[in-house]
Amino acid sequence: MPAAERREMVLEAAVAEFAAHGLAGTSTEDVARQAGISQPYLFRLFPTKKALFLALVERCFRRVEDTFTAAAGDLTGDEAMDAMADSYTRLLDDRTLLLLQMQIYAACSDPEIRDATRAAYKHLWEMIERITGLPFQTVVDFFAIGMLMNVAAAMDLPSVDERWTSWCPKDADDCPKD
C-alpha cells in the first residue's frame, strides 16, 4: 500500500483516538494499532505525535470549510450564511469530529497548536466573510452561535432540555430532537 494511503489510514484512526483522549492522553501505539501498522512506521509517516495532531487540525478545519463552501454554493449574504449554519448542524452529528474540535481548542496551550489553530480559524473566518459579504458583527455572531452549538452538542444538552434546540430553524429535520 502506498505511503499516502497509509497516511490516510493513520489519520482516520487518529481522529477517533485524539477525539476521545486529547493530545496528552492519546498513545501513538494505540493509533498505530488502530491503523494496522507498527508504531515505528507511524513515525515514518508523522515524525512526532504533535505532527500527527497538527495534520488533524488542518483536516478538521478543511472539512468544515468544504462543508460550508458546498452549502453556500453560489449564494451570498444571509442566504449563504443560513445555508452554512444549516450544514453545520448536520456536521455536528459526527460526534467524533465535534469532540476532535473540542480537543483541538483544549490543546491550544501548546504554542505550535495554538498558532496552527488560529491560522485555520482565521482562514475559515475570512472565507465566510468573502462568501457572504456580511458585516463583521454578523460573522462574529455566526461564530459565537457555532461555538455555543459545539459546547451544547458536546454535552448533549438538547437531550436534557429542548430549549437548547432553539437555535435550529423551525422546519429543520436535522436538528437534535428529544
What are these regions (language model features)?
Residues E17, L91, M127:
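Short alpha-helical functional segments enriched in proximate histidine and acidic residues
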Residues P111-H123, I128-D178:
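Hydrophobic/aromatic-rich alpha-helical bundle segments in the mid-to-C-terminal region
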Residues E79-M102, A107-D115:
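Helical hydrophobic small-molecule/effector-binding pocket
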Residues E5-R6, I37:
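The short coil/loop that forms the "turn" connecting the two helices of the helix-turn-helix
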Residues E29, P40:
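Residues within helix-turn-helix
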Residues M9-A16, A20, Q34, R44, ...:
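Alpha-helical structural segments
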